[in-house]
Amino acid sequence: MAAVKLNGKWGFIDKSGKIIAKPEFDDVEDFSEGLAKVELNGKWGFIDKSGEFAIKPEFDNVGDFSEGLAEVELNRKWGFIDKSGKIVIEPKFDDIDY
């Protein structure tokens, strides 16, 4: 998968150039553990490799998934979610180094 920018918006294409996630995002990051970080209207979420939302954009910031968890920021506090988007450690920390 490759991130591509078209008309100021980001999306993803596969190796043949087929659009997997149409360019509609303000920003994107590479895939990690099968999910890619995407920003839409100032909030971050994750899409899967079919281009569908795995976790809807609702976080102020997010980190990559590692060992099934990703750090997330809500209201200037950090915690962790699992791959279903469930908060497993409540955002209550000023910072996380994961």
Regions from the PLM with identified roles:
Residues M1-Y98:
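Residue-level detector of conserved, function-critical positions
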